[in-house]
From Swiss-Prot:
Effect of S213A: Reduced phosphorylation. Increased transcriptional and antiproliferative activities. Further increase in transcriptional and antiproliferative activities
Predominant place of localization: cytoplasm
GO CC terms: chromatin; ciliary basal body; cytoplasm; cytosol; heteromeric SMAD protein complex; intracellular membrane-bounded organelle; nuclear inner membrane; nucleoplasm
Site (Required for trimerization): K40
Protein name, per record: Mothers against decapentaplegic homolog 3
Domain notes: The MH1 domain is required for DNA binding. Also binds zinc ions which are necessary for the DNA binding.
Family: Belongs to the dwarfin/SMAD family.
Organism the protein comes from: Homo sapiens
InterPro entries membership: Dwarfin (IPR013790), MAD_homology1_Dwarfin-type (IPR003619), MAD_homology_MH1 (IPR013019), SMAD-like_dom_sf (IPR017855), SMAD_dom_Dwarfin-type (IPR001132), SMAD_FHA_dom_sf (IPR008984), SMAD_MH1_sf (IPR036578)
Any Pfam family the entry gives: MH1
Biased composition, class Polar residues, residue ranges: 165-177
Modified residues (N-acetylserine): S2
Binding positions for Zn(2+) per the UniProt entry: C64, C109, C121, H126
Signal sequence interval, chain numbering: none
């Protein structure tokens, strides 16, 4: 490998030789600076040999390699900030790593990032990639009775939802602007995995599907499996009660919806360029405050929403609401710099398996759970002047395609005609 910067120490060259993935010239320079920065820190603490041993042997049974934890948990390398364990795991193991949500520390790691100690371990072999759990197939009895018409779907559009604030126990992330590396998705901020799990999983339904009820034991049971679609969600943008622009189809595991005027791409849905002849002054003012908007992650069968805007976002997620024991229509305020788990595939799978035992209508009602509504800047509900989502100036609706298609297959197996599942707006 040719020297990128003059006077590259031999140890840095050796470590760069183990780098994964191909980068352009600018990115190669940044990688070298990241390695030089780490080498400089480890020389002072005598851990350099252990780093080289871990990288060259690719062995988990190496020691923790630690650097001091900064105040906000991030490491700055050449005007770019990121979480240190993510930076070095991406550099030496997974060049396609998007976020710390994709990493889980090994049990043997004594200074894992999520432990919030004064030192943080950056040994890339002390972390493992979170794998998407395989969802068990739903066993569906084949019914002969086809419903004459679909039951009415629970519709939260015209009721006044309750309001709640960001769940206590989740620390807000530091809201420091960052410059993502070219071709990479930027890391999100600092949230303790332990705290996230403790708070988010409270009240979760039992994740093991219930066995079929005795009444179904003698029926012909057909397994209906979950299939991951090419586009994990579809996003529609609304101003008041009018849909604006085309539906965005998300294929990337991390993408943003923002208020800027850049052309949209697979990782960004930019609302700034969308025109609407009926746009009023209130909508125009709100659009100016969307800013960096919201980042959506789909990782390990879970969906997270992170507020990047300087103003709060407001989320109505029936799946999240069930986890907390709230009313299904509750709207949760997410302050700037915080993120919230808004959907969990395993929880949905358990609910679907239980609902099959309760009949067609119970399964059909889960359609509403696959739709998430989110408003920018202005909230709605009982505590706000605007009491319905269609009264908010700027909002989006997410349709989770995998769960919706799974529902469609289950309903078809139960005896319904094939339908296009959608929410009632």
């Amino acid at each position: 490998m040719s020297s990128i910067l003059p006077f590259t120490p031999p140890i840095v060259k050796r470590l760069l030789g183990w780098k994964k993935g191909e980068q352009n010239g600018q990115e190669e320079k940044w990688c070298e600076k990241a390695v030089k920065s780490l080498v400089k820190k480890l020389k002072k603490t005598g851990q350099l040999d252990e780093l080289e041993k871990a990288i060259t042997t690719q062995n988990v049974n190496t020691k923790c390699i630690t650097i001091p934890r900064s105040l906000d948990g991030r490491l700055q390398v050449s005007h770019r900030k990121g979480l240190p364990h993510v930076i070095y795991c991406r550099l030496w193991r997974w060049p396609d790593l998007h976020s710390h949500h994709e990493l889980r520390a090994m049990e043997l790691c004594e200074f894992a990032f999520n432990m919030k100690k004064d030192e943080v371990c950056v040994n890339p072999y002390h972390y493992q990639r979170v794998e998407t759990p395989v969802l068990p197939p739903v066993l569906v009895p084949r019914h002969t009775e086809i419903p004459a018409e679909f039951p009415p779907l629970d519709d939260y559009s015209h009721s006044i939802p309750e309001n709640t604030n960001f769940p206590a126990g989740i620390e807000p992330q530091s809201n420091i602007p960052e410059t993502p590396p070219p071709g990479y998705l930027s890391e999100d901020g600092e949230t303790s995995d332990h705290q996230m799990n403790h708070s988010m999983d409270a009240g979760s339904p039992n994740l093991s599907p219930n066995p079929m009820s005795p009444a179904h034991n003698n029926l012909d049971l057909q397994p209906v499996t979950y299939c991951e679609p090419a586009f994990w969600c579809s996003i529609s943008y609304y101003e008041l009660n009018q849909r604006v622009g085309e539906t965005f189809h998300a294929s990337q595991p991390s993408m943003t919806v923002d208020g800027f005027t850049d052309p949209s791409n697979s990782e960004r849905f930019c609302l700034g360029l969308l025109s609407n002849v009926n746009r009023n002054a209130a909508v125009e003012l709100t659009r100016r405050h969307i800013g960096r908007g919201v980042r959506l992650y789909y990782i390990g069968g879970e969906v997270f929403a992170e507020c990047l805007s300087d103003s709060a976002i407001f989320v109505q997620s029936p799946n999240c609401n069930q986890r907390y024991g709230w009313h299904p229509a509750t709207v949760c305020k997410i302050p700037p710099g915080c993120n919230l788990k808004i959907f969990n595939n395993q929880e949905f799978a358990a609910l679907l398996a239980q609902s099959v035992n309760q009949g067609f209508e119970a399964v059909y009602q889960l359609t509403r759970m696959c739709t998430i509504r989110m408003s920018f800047v202005k909230g709605w509900g009982a505590e706000y002047r605007r009491q319905t989502v269609t009264s908010t100036p700027c909002w989006i609706e997410l349709h989770l395609n995998g769960p919706l298609q799974w529902l469609d297959k289950v309903l078809t197996q139960m005896g319904s005609p094939s339908i296009r599942c959608s929410s009632v707006s």
